Every structure is written in C-alpha cells, then in structure tokens.
C-alpha cells in the first residue's frame, strides 16, 4: 500500500476493538432479557402450586405472613391499669360539676402562666458587682448568724406547719422563689 493511505493502523485496531465490545455487550444484554422473561413466566404460575400440610409452617409470632390462619383470642381489656385522672362524673351530680368553677384561678394553674401583660411581670433586681474583699467580715458573720437562726427557727416549728411546708413543694414556682430568696445575701 502507499504511504498516503489516510488512517494509521492503530485507529483501525481501536475501531475493531470497540465494535467487538459492542457486539459482546449486545449479546449479554439480550441473554439477560430472555432469562428475565423466562423467570417471570415461572413466577406467574407458582400460585397454582398447593403445598402439602406438612410443608406449611405457621410461626408462633409471625411478623408479616401467616396471619389468616391464627384464631384470635378474646381480649380482656380490664387487664390494663387505669390511669390516675379525674373520675368521670354523671350529669345528675350538679354539686360536683359546680365545684371546679369555685376553685380560684391560681389553684388551677399548674406550671406556666399564659398572662403576658406587663402589669403582672416583675423584674429581678440586678446583682451588685462588689467584691467579697470589699465587704467587711462583720457582714459575713452576720449572714452566717442569720442562716443559723433561720435553721433553728425551722426546726422549732411544731408538726402542724408540716402541711404548709409540703404545700410549698407542690408549687415549683413558689419553691424556687424561696430558694432564690435564701441564696441572695441580706444587706
């Protein structure tokens, strides 16, 4: 052949290799498609197969299947513990129905107030930025004596006041207010 043939030999080799790869890929895709169609025909006719009794296995606690063969047991709904709540009242008891309306609004409020008016809000006083060294030792001794006297007063109360103390713990806002008041130093 002449030296001006147009395409070098390696381009013809590359073109032949790509053509061969295309033919092989086409053969694999066609065989995969035929195999898939044959499997679908097998699965279509599998519903006609009836298993023998010993082949059918029913699980004790099935997750997804075998639910149609299980006989439902009668449920006893009294086995659950009743929640602690207000008992249901009948319409024939007018005294009990009117009783919650007589309770003040503060007693019914549990945790958060929904009143967003400025009138009801109180600001906390700003903390003073004085160093402990600036205060005299007398004020520290006085606060320690006051705390000891408060502890002694609490212990000296008779048992009748235990009801008042327990009611303080029922109201979290009041309890935290008392704790904050005890922590702030007396000036």
UniProtKB/Swiss-Prot annotation:
InterPro entries: T-cell_rcpt-assoc_TM_adapter-1. Present in T-cells (at protein level). Residues 80-83 are annotated as: Interaction with PIK3R1. The modification Phosphoserine is found at residue 46. GO terms for cellular component: centriolar satellite; mitotic spindle; plasma membrane; T cell receptor complex. It is found in: Cell membrane. It is a single-pass type III membrane protein. Residues 1-7 are extracellular. Residues 117-138 are annotated as: Disordered. One of its GO terms (biological process) is adaptive immune response. Phosphorylated on tyrosines upon TCR activation. The chain crosses the membrane at residues 8-28. Residues 29-187 are cytoplasmic. The keyword Translocase does not apply. The keyword Disulfide bond applies. Keywords: Adaptive immunity, Cell membrane, Disulfide bond, Immunity, Membrane, Phosphoprotein, Signal-anchor, Transmembrane, Transmembrane helix. The modification Phosphotyrosine is found at residue 80. Homodimer; disulfide-linked. Interacts with CD3Z. When phosphorylated, interacts with PIK3R1. Stabilizes the TCR (T-cell antigen receptor)/CD3 complex at the surface of T-cells. PANTHER family: T-CELL RECEPTOR-ASSOCIATED TRANSMEMBRANE ADAPTER 1. This is T-cell receptor-associated transmembrane adapter 1. It comes from Mus musculus. The gene is Trat1.
